[in-house]
Amino acid sequence: MPSTVLAVDTPQGPGRCFVDPAEDPTALLVLGHGAGGGTNAADLELLARRLPVLGITVVRFEQPWRTAGRRIAGPPATLDEAWTAAVTELRGRPWAVGRLFVGGRSAGARVACRTAQAVGAAGVVCLAFPLHLPGRPEKSRAAELLGAGVPRLVLQGSKDTFGTPAEIQAAMGSAPGIRLVELPGADHGFRVAKAASFSAADLRARVLAEVGLFVGG
């Protein structure tokens, strides 16, 4: 069944929401895309297709810059403003019931962390959190992850050049409220080698199980 597409006005222009509703929802999960991809990223689509049967309505928000056909994302403040407006508007919909969780892939996870408290989220799902640019570990974004102020689930590939699980663990230290899950052999896009012992099917199952438990549990 195709997602329902909704237009959402924001201070940064119109964005789009792709809604996959649960029949008897207990939670709402709003997900954002990365700077280099859209709402059709494999992991975002996986969650949108499979979580509703667990009672979780999934909404994938397309930022206005991408809706407008631009290739480059705007500054973080503009992303946060558009996201906050969209999530706030969505919460007013009659089908948006249950506890609110936010999250996203890569840059979308950063936005979700920065705005979690402002939108009243119960938790944040981080898919491939970009701790730093490849080869630039000194430019850490750990403060965004650590400062979310709500429980966080971080799913990170062991071969992610934007930050390995070990790097994220080091940045976390003993900070409470963060569950870090390593995806063996996966890169930033959650791709694994065909011959890997931890297969693509294993990865999808792990992602679904972890997010389903975090949001629906």
Where in the sequence are the language-model features?
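Catalytic histidine neighborhood in serine/cysteine hydrolases
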Residues: 174-191
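Primarily recognizes the serine-hydrolase "nucleophile elbow" in alpha/beta-hydrolase
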Residues: 83-150
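Short beta-strand/loop motif that positions the catalytic acidic residue
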Residues: 147-149, 154-156, 160
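The conserved SAM/SAH-binding core of class I Rossmann-like methyltransferase domains
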Residues: 61, 127, 155
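Short alpha-helix in the alpha/beta-hydrolase fold that links the catalytic acid
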Residues: 44, 138-141, 150, 163-172
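Serine-hydrolase catalytic machinery in alpha/beta-hydrolase-like enzymes
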Residues: 5-99, 187-198
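Acidic catalytic loop of the alpha/beta-hydrolase fold
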Residues: 158-162, 188-189
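Catalytic active-site module of serine/aspartate enzymes centered on a nucleophile-bearing elbow/loop
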Residues: 194-217
